[in-house]
């Protein structure tokens, strides 16, 4: 039996007898060749540009995945002693494609059966063994078509970006619309004009004084008071409402607060309502809720969920269906009744159906595995950290989905104050909500993204018992100013939601898209918010002007629907690819669109006027402000051109004309000599660079002179020699740990100040602690538990467990050339598109396998300590025969 991962193989092996040998392919064993790796003899053929022959049925050129030669040899060797082959890869498109590639490469001479399951339990595995099927060729072709169209899109458009904007940029079928959404939201924020308004709130007491409550002014003589929702995004007031400014609001508050004014309840209305539980998780809703509740990225969520699935704790994590099987419904209802009481369970089983048209993903929601769900408490000794938190989230959501509606009662009271001194009557309103029956709320409550102009005072609360005509006493009255807020930036959760609502992408792609747009430098994260970089504005503007249809949301969604039709066998893949690439009567194809880009001035493409005199430009080394002044004047070149750096932390919507002028008007930071280092006799210089101000020891013989960045709390204008020498002395040795004999050093990094002892780090609270903390203070920090420490500073950064091939313990470390993974025998560099934080164990094992393959080493064998290098190993490649039946 062949599965994708060692962890999955290990779990399944527990449920099968000795007659089965369960092996892992560790992901794909064959992939579409990168164009740069196309063999020489094919470079000048139709395969040369894309590794896809677009002139002959879009035939792809496949090659063995790096590091998989040994895996293939092992699988072939195992097949020799087998009398049957079960392909047990995942049940989605990707899993079906892996199974097909295994067949193509292994060419088994024994009977082959395809088995699928959505959870790894003994019962599910046995059920899958009893109900095998043939390979789904439509699914395979759908995956292949997606891979080809993504290759055509990326490799046709990206080179245009290199020529017109900058090298290293990339475009993607789903990636580019995702970036466009983020950029468009930032454009809305940049165009937004904030408006000011006031409201008046009062705190009333009942006559008995038993309970006070807050109410908000709603009308004045019947005219509604303006709130944040009454302004458009340009700050214009809409609707027939009364706008209170500071003077009128203060005068009104004073009038309400005068003694002798009549205050009485004019109406009390109670409205019962019910709240239904949320549906069980799909891939996208799991990513959204894990982001909101657990602060996990989409990739962290998927990696954690994959681990839970492979260990047999949850069902398959890539699905767009919220449906539960009858077995799962029974398990959820039974557990809800046991833990929360029989009356907490819905009268009848709840059946959820999905809205997605994509019929080719897994067909059940993400839920705890098995006929009886394990409670989080039962797994508390087995699951830890993110794994436990995510399992608990899934368990709660699943159980709650079969529980009864919550019953809620909302009471709204209207209170009349007046007549006031001018004869007008002010009407206040107060609402209180109480839960009369908790139902599913006993287990779980869904989170939501924060709304714009949200009034925190209207949070749920309980009102005292009030009656119409009842007199009240005024406790206090306050006038408060407010500013309307711009549209909120996307978070990973809300961006996934937007993509899903627009029909862009599929469950299996969202996590990769979130990671890619950040890794490729188009988007950064500020807390949970996604902030576009200026280069994203440049790229999206260029794509909108030249490839508008290709990044149009509706067009991208229609492509997804077409690809689903291919999976259903309703569309011919080759005909569809031909229409997409070469075009037809109804549209210009990608090929002609890319080839007919008009000549454009690169400076114009990369320019954004901030004012008539100030222009923002995106360059090779990032964004900057350009102005022209008197040639030869301070900061200007002979043509009068002056460059002003933009602070790295300044978001695009914060670069207003006023802010740009402030940056231009700021004192010019010039390089200067601060003095002489008494220890070396070399000058200490102050400089201002792309990443901010720094000091440098001007050693003419040093290949890389010693530097030190200024702390955020330091001013370039007041930096002196003493402070500069302190910066150049870092890292500072605080003292020696008496237990280990290791030096403890204090230093500053990208994520702030920290201590380092050997391979162990601890964060410091403030930058000045770097110079002030003593040995006793440092030892006290190390005596405290380490909570989510600095991954980039500590070594090892992560532990992945035992490598299934070498048996070594795999860890992630950082070295002179960046992060890498090691099993104690071999080190493998972590590619720039991967991150240590989000890396799964299987990915770490795969990198080590590829490295061993490249070095020609067996698992557990270390490289010879010599400078000699062996001959470069050539990866065998195969071309899928045209029209070959799968």
Language-model region placement:
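C-terminal or mid-to-C-terminal helical accessory/interaction module adjacent to the motor/catalytic core
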Residues: 67, 73, 80-81, 120-204, ...
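Pre-Walker A segment
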Residues: 250-279, 284, 290, 477-483
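Intrinsically disordered, low-complexity regulatory segments
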Residues: 1-147, 156, 228-231, 239-255, ...
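C-terminal helical "lid" subdomain and adjoining coupling/linker elements of P-loop NTPases
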Residues: 164-168, 183-245, 293, 439
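Basic, low-complexity terminal or inter-domain segments flanking catalytic cores
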Residues: 10-11, 18-20, 158, 191, ...
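A conserved hydrophobic secondary-structure block that centers on an alpha-helix together
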Residues: 90, 287-289, 293-301
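Conserved nucleotide-binding/hydrolysis micro-motifs of P-loop NTPases
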Residues: 6-9, 26-32, 91-95, 118-124, ...
């Amino acid at each position: 039996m062949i599965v994708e991962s060692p962890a999955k193989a290990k779990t399944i092996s527990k449920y099968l007898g000795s007659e089965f040998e369960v092996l892992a392919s560790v992901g794909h064993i064959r992939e579409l060749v990168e164009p740069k790796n196309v063999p020489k003899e094919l470079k000048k053929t139709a395969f040369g540009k894309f590794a896809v022959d677009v002139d002959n049925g879009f035939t792809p050129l496949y090659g063995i995945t790096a590091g998989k030669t040994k895996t293939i040899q092992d699988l072939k060797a195992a097949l020799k002693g087998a009398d049957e082959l079960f392909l047990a890869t995942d049940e989605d498109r990707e899993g079906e494609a892996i199974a097909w590639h295994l067949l193509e490469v292994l060419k088994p001479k024994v009977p082959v059966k395809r088995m699928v399951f959505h959870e790894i339990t003994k019962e599910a595995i046995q059920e899958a063994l009893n109900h095998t099927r043939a390979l789904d060729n439509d699914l395979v072709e759908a995956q292949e078509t997606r891979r080809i169209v993504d290759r055509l899109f990326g490799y046709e458009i990206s080179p245009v970006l290199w020529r017109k904007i900058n090298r290293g940029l990339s475009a993607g079928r789903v990636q580019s619309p995702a970036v466009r959404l983020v950029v468009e939201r930032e454009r809305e924020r940049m165009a937004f004009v904030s408006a000011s308004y006031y409201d008046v709130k009062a705190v009333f007491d009942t006559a008995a004084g038993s309970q006070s409550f807050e109410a908000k002014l709603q009308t004045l003589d019947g005219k509604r008071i303006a709130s944040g929702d009454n302004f458009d995004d340009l700050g214009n007031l809409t609707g027939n409402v009364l706008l209170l400014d500071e003077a009128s609001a203060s005068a009104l508050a004073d009038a309400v607060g005068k003694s002798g004014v009549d205050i009485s309840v004019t109406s009390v209305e109670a409205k019962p309502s019910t709240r239904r539980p949320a549906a069980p998780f799909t891939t996208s809703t799991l990513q959204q809720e894990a982001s909101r509740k657990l602060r996990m990225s989409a990739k962290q969520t998927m990696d954690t969920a994959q681990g839970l699935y492979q260990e047999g704790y949850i069902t398959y994590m890539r699905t767009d269906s919220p449906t539960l099987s009858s077995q799962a419904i029974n398990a959820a209802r039974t557990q809800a009744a046991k833990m929360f009481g029989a009356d907490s369970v819905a009268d009848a089983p709840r059946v959820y159906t999905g809205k997605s048209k994509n019929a080719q993903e897994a067909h059940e929601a993400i839920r705890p595995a098995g006929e009886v769900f394990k409670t989080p408490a039962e797994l508390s000794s087995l699951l830890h950290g993110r794994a436990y938190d995510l399992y608990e989230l899934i368990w709660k959501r699943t159980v709650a989905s079969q529980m009864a509606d919550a019953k809620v009662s909302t009471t709204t009271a209207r209170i009349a104050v007046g007549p006031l001194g001018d004869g007008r009557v002010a009407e206040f309103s107060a609402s209180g909500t109480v839960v009369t029956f908790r139902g599913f709320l006993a287990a779980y409550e869904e989170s939501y993204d924060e709304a714009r102009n949200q009034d925190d005072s209207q949070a749920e609360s309980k009102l005292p018992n009030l009656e119409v005509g009842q007199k009240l006493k005024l406790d206090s009255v306050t006038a408060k100013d407010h500013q309307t807020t711009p549209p909120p930036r996307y978070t990973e959760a809300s961006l996934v939601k937007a993509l899903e609502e627009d029909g862009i992408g599929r469950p299996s792609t969202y996590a990769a898209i979130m990671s890619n747009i950040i890794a490729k430098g188009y988007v950064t994260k500020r807390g949970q918010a996604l902030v576009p970089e200026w280069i994203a504005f440049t790229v999206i503007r260029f794509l909108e002007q030249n490839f508008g249809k290709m990044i149009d949301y509706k067009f991208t969604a229609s492509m997804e629907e077409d690809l689903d039709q291919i999976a259903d066998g309703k569309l011919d893949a080759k005909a569809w690819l031909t229409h997409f690439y070469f075009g037809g009567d109804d549209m210009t194809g990608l090929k002609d669109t890319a080839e007919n880009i008009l000549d454009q001035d690169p400076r114009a493409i990369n320019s954004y006027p901030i004012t008539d005199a100030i222009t923002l430009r995106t360059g090779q080394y990032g964004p900057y402000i350009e102005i022209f002044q008197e040639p030869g004047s301070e900061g200007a070149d002979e043509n009068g051109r002056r460059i002003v750096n933009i602070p790295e932390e300044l978001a695009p919507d914060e670069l207003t004309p006023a802010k740009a002028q402030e940056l231009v008007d700021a004192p010019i930071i010039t390089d200067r000599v601060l003095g002489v280092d008494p220890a070396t006799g070399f000058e200490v210089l102050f400089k201002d660079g792309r990443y901010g101000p720094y000091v440098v020891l001007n050693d003419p013989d040093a290949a890389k002179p010693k530097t030190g960045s200024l702390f955020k709390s330091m001013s370039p204008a007041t930096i002196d020699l003493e402070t500069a020498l302190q910066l150049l002395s870092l890292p500072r040795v605080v003292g020696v740990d008496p237990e280990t004999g290791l030096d403890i050093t204090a230093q500053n990094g990208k994520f702030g100040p920290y201590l380092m002892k050997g391979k162990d780090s601890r964060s410091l609270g403030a930058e000045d602690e770097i110079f002030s903390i003593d040995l006793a203070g440092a030892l006290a920090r190390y005596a405290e538990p380490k909570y989510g420490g600095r991954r980039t500073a500590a070594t090892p950064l992560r532990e992945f467990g035992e490598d299934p091939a070498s048996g070594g313990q795999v860890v992630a470390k950082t070295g002179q050339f960046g992060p890498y993974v090691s099993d104690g025998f071999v080190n493998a560099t972590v590619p720039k598109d991967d991150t240590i934080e989000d890396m799964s164990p299987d990915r770490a094992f795969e990198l080590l396998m590829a490295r061993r393959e490249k070095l020609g080493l067996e698992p557990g064998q270390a490289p010879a300590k010599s400078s000699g290098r062996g001959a470069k190993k050539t990866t065998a490649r195969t071309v899928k025969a045209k029209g070959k039946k799968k």
